[in-house]
Regions:
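C-terminal segment of classical bacterial N-terminal signal peptides
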Residues: 18-27
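Active-site-adjacent loops and short helices of periplasmic peptidoglycan-processing enzymes
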Residues: 32-221, 228-234, 245-249
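Domain-terminus/edge residues, biased toward the C-terminal soluble/receptor-binding domains
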Residues: 201-204, 212-430
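A generic local structural motif
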Residues: 15, 70-72, 280
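Bacterial N-terminal signal peptides that target proteins for export
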Residues: 1-12
Length: 430
């Protein structure tokens, strides 16, 4: 009967703790999980080490991972581009890969990074759309495509954004670079640093406009990463990329992105051209809520660039579809709760979870909910509690956050003591 005596002593101790030191019990319940039984601890220690698995990534992040994987069907398409990269950013599925990690000249597609930094400054409140920058002689004398800013004039940030996007103004880029960093050289260093932060490991910038310069490189994949981060990070400013023409200084110019006028759903981003690198374009289009991003480079003419970009984009929408695994707010699993008024809490996805596969192919992704449980109460609705690991058709694992789908208050003192007594007295057989 010694075990019973020990249990009764423990019972008396717990009651004393509840009566005299309830606040301490509250803190313990918030900071830790429910106590494990000795038998469980022994079993856990005897388990062999798990086999290493590929590290999972978050949606969007795996666009930058060095993979050439296509969906299992290996549906392919030839392209005239020297470099090409197409991705569904919402599922991180690569649909087309051709020398996408090979260094290439960024040309005017480098302006996307200058614009990204401007958007970042606006979102942080360090800039306003009506903030004005003065035009230097260096900016005024820039060659190539221009906004036609006048020496000594002051131009608003909003006009400079349109000048960089719609008019592809090299002069506008220099005005921005000098306004934000003092010199274009310093701004280029900032561009390269930001590229590394975004996962653009193959990009080095030497100026703000993409003007040919020794040692300036990017990759098709890197530009796709930048395109997606622009769309996802700054939806309130991305609208500028869809403007088809603009008048500045009494000069009307059309956006060089012809797909804005010819290909359904196109809403950005940027074209580019250098003698050595050829004609290139980073394009994004959305149809029925599904977005594709395509980067091509090395075309021989503006016409070929427009035709090839449109053809490949149509192929991507036609040959692949997205299957919804979970809608926003759907419950993926229920997790046990320790010392809560409810025994379980629903784990929900805050955003839609989809899988990309060839059109007509049945999709049955494997989904595993990961969390550390039991989860200690109280739990507030919307609190991140774990992840849903979704295995895609190409074998990659993407992790989506799981949040509490409901509030779970903590039990009162008597309820907590009762739960703890039950755990210690009867946990052996539970």
């Amino acid at each position: 009967m010694s075990w019973l005596t020990d249990r009764l002593r423990l019972l008396a101790g717990l009651i004393a703790v509840a009566a005299l030191a309830a606040p301490s019990l509250d803190v313990w319940a918030q900071q830790g999980d429910a106590p494990k039984k000795p038998a469980q601890q022994a079993q856990q220690q005897q388990k062999p080490p798990a086999k290493p698995r590929p590290a999972p990534t978050k949606p969007g992040q795996s666009i930058a991972s060095k993979t050439e994987a296509l969906p299992p069907s290996q549906i392919g398409i030839g392209t005239l581009a020297k470099q090409a990269f197409m991705v569904d950013p919402q599922t991180s599925t690569v649909l087309l890969f051709k020398d996408a990690d090979k260094p290439m000249h960024p040309s005017s597609m480098a302006k996307m990074m200058t614009i990204y930094i401007v958007f970042e400054e606006l979102a942080a409140g360090r800039l306003k759309l009506d903030t004005k920058f003065r035009v230097s002689e260096r900016a005024r004398n820039m060659g190539g495509s221009r906004m036609f800013v006048e020496l000594g004039s002051e131009v608003s940030v909003e006009d400079l954004i349109k000048g960089m996007i719609v008019l592809s103004g090299n002069d506008a880029c220099v005005v921005v670079a000098e306004g934000l960093s003092g010199t274009e050289e310093s701004f280029a260093e900032r561009m390269t640093k930001k590229a590394k932060e975004l996962g653009m490991t193959g990009s080095v910038f030497k100026n703000s406009s993409g003007w040919p310069a020794e040692g300036q490189w990017t990759t098709a994949r890197d530009l796709a990463v930048l395109a997606w981060r622009t769309i996802d990070d700054f939806p309130q400013y991305y609208k500028y990329y869809s403007e088809t023409n603009w008048i500045y200084n009494n000069i009307k110019q059309d956006n060089r992105n012809r797909l804005l006028r010819t290909t359904a759903g196109t809403d950005g981003l940027k074209t580019g051209h250098t003698e050595e690198g050829g004609y290139g374009q980073a394009t994004s289009a959305i149809r029925d809520g599904r977005r594709l991003i395509l980067v091509v480079n090395g075309m021989t003419s503006m016409a070929e660039r427009a035709q090839e970009t449109s053809r490949v984009m149509e192929w991507g929408f036609r040959e692949f579809t997205n299957t919804t695994v979970f809608r926003a707010g759907d419950t993926v699993a229920e997790a046990p709760v320790w010392l809560g008024t409810q025994d379980k809490v629903p784990l929900v996805v805050p955003r839609m979870v989809q899988v990309t596969a060839p059109t007509g192919q049945a999709v049955s992704p494997r989904v595993i909910a990961k969390y550390d449980g039991p989860l200690p109460a109280p739990i507030a609705k919307g609190t991140k509690l774990g992840v849903a690991a979704v295995t895609l058709p190409d074998g990659r694992v993407i992790e989506y956050p799981l949040e509490a789908g409901a509030d779970v208050p903590r039990k009162g003192v008597l309820g907590r003591v009762t739960a703890m007594i039950g755990h210690y007295l009867f946990g052996w057989w539970s």
